[in-house]
Amino acid sequence: MERPGSNGSCSGCRLEGGPAARAASGLAAVLIVTIVVDVLGNALVILSVLRNKKLRNAGNIFVVSLSVADLVVAVYPYPLILSAIFHNGWTMGNIHCQISGFLMGLSVIGSIFNITAIAINRYCYICHSLRYDKLFNLKNTCCYICLTWTLTVVAIVPNFFVGSLQYDPRIYSCTFAQTVSTSYTITVVVVHFIVPLSIVTFCYLRIWILVIQVKHRVRQDCKQKIRAADIRNFLTMFVVFVLFAVCWGPLNFIGLAVSINPSKVQPHIPEWLFVLSYFMAYFNSCLNAVIYGLLNQNFRKEYKRILLMLRTPRLLFIDVSKGGTEGLKSKPSPAVTNNNQAEIHL
């Protein structure tokens, strides 16, 4: 799905080469910031959901799953990329190269599949509210999470058979080489990027249409209201989707163009654009936790509590929330009728 061409395989030898020293320093700085924010931010997300009953609902199980996908790259592939930058080449051997490439793909495909699952969850919650509690009870939600990750693993395993996980010195990464097989690369981009984004777009368009319809009905009879907080909660996950598309779109479309006609297209793509598209994609893994903190009041308050309690670590695992749902039960679904208010929760 994710990666344009690569310059060669890693067979255990030292592979050198890459951008100039100044550019490499900039890439290292971006990656260090990404790793720090990724680890701290997504740890805050997971702790927030574990600690606060108000955040424990079916929708946020997918948010935690998305955070896990973002954490995967920060704890293994990104540090290896940093090492390659500092050594001006890959020195960790073929096994680490293959594992790094696999985990990178697992994280990216896991992210887009979880974003798709979140969109479907929001769509069912808003547009099919009467059936939401049955569709997204705890048991079903856990099954959906397992299905999401199973599909993710199935999607990435073929890379080993195609031989597409290779080291690319331009980006100091072991990654998916789009030029190995044109048909496979096109399939990967379509199935792992275009189709999920199309599903997400459909779900959010349907939600927007319903919200607009409810607003118009409010103006007509003055009996309904959609709270600003409800709209912000929906917008949080919409912004997560938009940022993912913006960060990963250039890399996918460059890779798709290169795979269709490598000899004609690849020479016309500047190396700086290729490298920039990659590190834009890498940077995306640290953004989601920041978005939750900026746009969702419950997450923001819990972030503050956790940060203030770092002086007393034992308090981190004490549930301080009051009210809300018990355990991980689904919240009551809103009925969107002429006499009911549309509730939109994260």
Curated annotation (Swiss-Prot):
<dbReference type="GO" id="GO:0008502">
    <property type="term" value="F:melatonin receptor activity"/>
</dbReference>
<feature type="topological domain" description="Extracellular">
    <location>
        <begin position="259"/>
        <end position="271"/>
    </location>
</feature>
<dbReference type="InterPro" id="IPR017452">
    <property type="entry name" value="GPCR_Rhodpsn_7TM"/>
</dbReference>
<keyword id="KW-1003">Cell membrane</keyword>
<keyword id="KW-0812">Transmembrane</keyword>
<feature type="transmembrane region" description="Helical; Name=7">
    <location>
        <begin position="272"/>
        <end position="292"/>
    </location>
</feature>
<feature type="transmembrane region" description="Helical; Name=1">
    <location>
        <begin position="27"/>
        <end position="47"/>
    </location>
</feature>
<dbReference type="Pfam" id="PF00001">
    <property type="entry name" value="7tm_1"/>
</dbReference>
<feature type="topological domain" description="Cytoplasmic">
    <location>
        <begin position="293"/>
        <end position="346"/>
    </location>
</feature>
<feature type="region of interest" description="Disordered">
    <location>
        <begin position="326"/>
        <end position="346"/>
    </location>
</feature>
<comment type="similarity">
    <text>Belongs to the G-protein coupled receptor 1 family.</text>
</comment>
<feature type="topological domain" description="Extracellular">
    <location>
        <begin position="161"/>
        <end position="184"/>
    </location>
</feature>
<feature type="transmembrane region" description="Helical; Name=4">
    <location>
        <begin position="140"/>
        <end position="160"/>
    </location>
</feature>
<comment type="function">
    <text>High affinity receptor for melatonin. The activity of this receptor is mediated by pertussis toxin sensitive G proteins that inhibits adenylate cyclase activity.</text>
</comment>
<feature type="transmembrane region" description="Helical; Name=3">
    <location>
        <begin position="100"/>
        <end position="120"/>
    </location>
</feature>
<feature type="compositionally biased region" description="Polar residues">
    <location>
        <begin position="335"/>
        <end position="346"/>
    </location>
</feature>
<feature type="transmembrane region" description="Helical; Name=6">
    <location>
        <begin position="238"/>
        <end position="258"/>
    </location>
</feature>
<protein>
    <recommendedName>
        <fullName>Melatonin receptor type 1C</fullName>
    </recommendedName>
</protein>
<dbReference type="InterPro" id="IPR000276">
    <property type="entry name" value="GPCR_Rhodpsn"/>
</dbReference>
<dbReference type="GO" id="GO:1904408">
    <property type="term" value="F:melatonin binding"/>
</dbReference>
<dbReference type="GO" id="GO:0045820">
    <property type="term" value="P:negative regulation of glycolytic process"/>
</dbReference>
<feature type="disulfide bond">
    <location>
        <begin position="97"/>
        <end position="174"/>
    </location>
</feature>
<dbReference type="GO" id="GO:0005886">
    <property type="term" value="C:plasma membrane"/>
</dbReference>
<keyword id="KW-0807">Transducer</keyword>
<dbReference type="InterPro" id="IPR000025">
    <property type="entry name" value="Melatonin_rcpt"/>
</dbReference>
<keyword id="KW-0472">Membrane</keyword>
<dbReference type="InterPro" id="IPR002279">
    <property type="entry name" value="Mel_rcpt_1C"/>
</dbReference>
<keyword id="KW-1133">Transmembrane helix</keyword>
<feature type="topological domain" description="Extracellular">
    <location>
        <begin position="82"/>
        <end position="99"/>
    </location>
</feature>
<keyword id="KW-0297">G-protein coupled receptor</keyword>
<feature type="glycosylation site" description="N-linked (GlcNAc...) asparagine">
    <location>
        <position position="7"/>
    </location>
</feature>
<feature type="topological domain" description="Cytoplasmic">
    <location>
        <begin position="48"/>
        <end position="60"/>
    </location>
</feature>
<feature type="transmembrane region" description="Helical; Name=5">
    <location>
        <begin position="185"/>
        <end position="205"/>
    </location>
</feature>
<feature type="topological domain" description="Cytoplasmic">
    <location>
        <begin position="206"/>
        <end position="237"/>
    </location>
</feature>
<feature type="topological domain" description="Extracellular">
    <location>
        <begin position="1"/>
        <end position="26"/>
    </location>
</feature>
<dbReference type="GO" id="GO:0005654">
    <property type="term" value="C:nucleoplasm"/>
</dbReference>
<feature type="topological domain" description="Cytoplasmic">
    <location>
        <begin position="121"/>
        <end position="139"/>
    </location>
</feature>
<dbReference type="GO" id="GO:0007186">
    <property type="term" value="P:G protein-coupled receptor signaling pathway"/>
</dbReference>
<dbReference type="GO" id="GO:0004930">
    <property type="term" value="F:G protein-coupled receptor activity"/>
</dbReference>
<dbReference type="GO" id="GO:0046325">
    <property type="term" value="P:negative regulation of D-glucose import"/>
</dbReference>
<keyword id="KW-1015">Disulfide bond</keyword>
<keyword id="KW-0675">Receptor</keyword>
